[in-house]
Each structure stands twice: as C-alpha cells, then as structure tokens.
C-alpha cells in the first residue's frame, strides 16, 4: 500500500504513537508539531469535557500559527469514575494511578478535533473505551513501576507494553486507548482528503 502524504495536514502532537497509528492507516501528516498548552483540568471538569477541551486547544494553538492548514488535535484521558488521571510525573504518582486502577474498570476518553483552514469549521469526535485491570499483586506493581513504561502515559499505563498483561477486558477501541481512534479519525479525514 502507498502511504498518503497529506501535506496540508498538521498533527498537533508530540506523540510517536499517534504518528505510528496514522501510518498504520497509510496517512502521513505534512507536519507534526507539539502544542504547548496548559493541561490543567478545570475545577469539577468531567473527563470527557476535559478530553474535548484539550484536543480542541491543541489544534487551535497550532492553527493560530498555521492558518492555512488542516490541524488534527488529539487528547487521551484515563478516568476512574469522575477522577481524571493525568500523566504521571514521577514514580509516586504512577504508583497511585496503578493502585487505583488495580482490579477496577476505568474509562479511556480519546477526543479528536479536526480544524479546517482559517477555523471555518471544526469537527470533534470522542471515543470512550472501558478497560478492566486484574487485581495486581505487590510484585506486579513493583515490576511495572521499575520498567518506567508509565512515563508520559495517561493514567501511567501503557497497554502496548507490560500493562497489557493486566487487562482482563477492553470494550471499545483498542487504538483509541493507545492514543488515536483509527475509525473515527479516518472518517473525519476522508471528508476532506482523498484517502483511497
């Protein structure tokens, strides 16, 4: 298959996983630019709303400097109930997240925002996936934390790596949990690009 190079598409992300996921469906953005935004949740902000706001903010930040481009902003949020689990900045935070998720269901919200040049239009899709982890032993928790796979991961979890062995079930989109819902992203982009 030939990879589609979409020269006038910017992926507003620093995530190599998202670039790899786009490549999986033969899409190569013209540019990949990280958006430096404040990612602090608002008081009492719900996980889905936070995910949408972050995806939109990332896209808007990049498009403000590149108004003639389509911009794809994406954000993935792990939530236990209404509690948003941010990226762990240290091993203590990662341990809190892993212990909280142990033996429980949690939701992963991934929002995709596509901005059209000059912000004449915006499209937002959010995919919710339910994931259940097995009850983790102390040994498993220590082993996972020592791996440092939790670094720069929403909720401190990398199901492509070691945390994959903790998943009892996943209901929804696997690619969304990794960082980009492929079906929804393909549908959004195919409205504006000839992908086939």
Curated annotation (Swiss-Prot):
Give yes or no: UniProt keyword Hydrolase. Answer: yes
Active site located where? 75
Disulfide bonds, paired cysteine numbers: none
Q: Which Pfam families match?
A: Maf (PF02545)
Q: What is its main location?
A: cytoplasm
Q: Mind listing the UniProt keywords for this protein, alphabetically? A: Cytoplasm, Hydrolase, Nucleotide metabolism
Judged by the first EC level, this protein's enzyme class is hydrolase
Its GO CC terms are:
cytoplasm
Q: Does the keyword Magnesium apply?
A: no
Which residues does the annotation list for site: Important for substrate specificity?
17, 76, 160
Q: Give the family this protein belongs to, as stated in its UniProt record.
A: Belongs to the Maf family. YhdE subfamily.
Name of protein: dTTP/UTP pyrophosphatase
